[in-house]
Swiss-Prot record:
Organism this protein belongs to: Mus musculus
Glycosylation site positions: 110, 159
Functional description taken from the UniProt entry: Possesses a trypsin-like cleavage specificity with a preference for poly-basic substrates. Stimulates epithelial sodium channel (ENaC) activity through activating cleavage of the gamma subunits (SCNN1G).
Protein name listed in UniProt: Prostasin
Keywords assigned: Cell membrane, Disulfide bond, Glycoprotein, Hydrolase, Membrane, Protease, Secreted, Serine protease, Signal, Transmembrane, Transmembrane helix, Zymogen
Length: 342
């Protein structure tokens, strides 16, 4: 009889470690449950530019008739959050698809999967770009398998508060300047932006405001960006995530919604404040459980950003330079300033 061949203690430990690493990379914990939300394997890289593959595993591309139209955020193995204005009523649900695990939109990768859309739920209060209720839920036609490139982000609970000055990250494949598309192979772009209080944001949007086109920062909106401009979001990535870190966990603090031109001074990006829709989310998707956000950082007063900023002016803007209101957003990542120089 042939002798039985077994593993020694050291070999068993090594195999166990390898199995655990494999489970973590596949998005499954050792107990067989799904990956926890808001966790990333790639280390965080601050600033702006091209992201690393798998750095923002909840980022999705929403396509219509095969063309990228919006971003979105994976929040479970069946649901994606995006902006309501990405889904005009005249558009057919069957023409939408969701691309997950993508890094370069123009390059094929085994890590990328495409799902059709089974259901689209938009908030009933949404009316037009710039109005409240700019949030939508998309149910995938079949559950997605988590991996190191496909993982969910955490939804914040209703009482969640993200402090002014907190550096968050907006991501997407949008234009790099007004009417200037991201060049092939269109790698995912990232931009770190500080949060701005609603009061200061309203103050900034009243600078050089056009009376016929008022800017209203609603209670369900969140602002982030730079007062001097040059780094912002632009056309093409509405619906994408504004991801904010709290104690090592990433939360979907905002959804790219609207803005006044791309990278213009005194015009930070405006996002749908996800936490204000926690009860609406639970009503429509009971299986999703928003997560309590730890309050470990105090908000920094930021009124000086408006009242004493050198760009401040009470004069009306020249008509030829007047920006377009309520523009769907995507990332400029500072390239806007270079584009303007030419």
């Amino acid at each position: 009889m042939a002798p039985r061949v077994g593993l020694g203690l050291g070999q068993l430990e090594a195999v166990t470690i390898l199995l655990l690493l494999g489970l973590l990379q596949s998005g499954i914990r050792a107990d067989g449950t799904e990956a926890s939300c808001g966790a990333v394997i790639q280390p965080r890289i601050t600033g702006g530019g091209s992201a690393k593959p798998g750095q923002w595993p909840w980022q999705v591309s929403i396509t219509y008739d095969g063309n990228h139209v919006c971003g979105g955020s994976l929040v479970s193995n069946k649901w994606v959050v995006s902006a309501a204005h990405c889904f005009p009523r005249e558009h057919s649900r069957e023409a939408y698809e969701v691309k997950l695990g993508a890094h370069q939109l123009d390059s094929y990768s085994n890590d990328t999967v495409v799902h059709t859309v089974a259901q689209i739920i938009t908030h009933s209060s949404y009316r037009e770009e710039g109005s409240q209720g700019d949030i939508a839920f998309i149910r995938l036609s079949s559950p997605v398998t988590f991996s190191r490139y496909i993982r969910p982000i955490c939804l914040p609970a209703a009482n969640a508060s993200f402090p002014n000055g907190l550096h968050c990250t907006v991501t997407g494949w949008g234009h790099v300047a007004p009417s200037v598309s991201l060049q092939t192979p269109r790698p995912l772009q990232q931009l770190e932006v500080p949060l701005i209080s609603r009061e200061t944001c309203s103050c900034l949007y009243n600078i050089n405001a056009v009376p016929e086109e008022p800017h209203t920062i609603q209670q369900d909106m969140l602002c982030a960006g730079y007062v001097k401009g040059g780094k912002d979001a632009c056309q093409g990535d509405s619906g994408g995530p504004l991801s904010c870190p709290m104690e090592g966990i990433w939360y979907l603090a905002g959804i790219v919604s609207w803005g006044d031109a791309c990278g213009a001074p005194n015009r930070p990006g405006v996002y749908t404040l996800t936490s204000t829709y926690a009860s609406w989310i639970h009503h429509h998707v009971a299986e999703l459980q928003p997560r309590v956000v730890p309050q470990t950082q105090e908000s920094q007063p930021d009124g000086h950003l408006c009242n004493h900023h050198p760009v401040f002016s009470s004069a009306a803007a020249p008509k030829l330079l007047r920006p377009v209101l309520f523009l769907p957003l995507g990332l400029t990542l500072g390239l806007l300033s270079l584009w303007l120089e030419h």
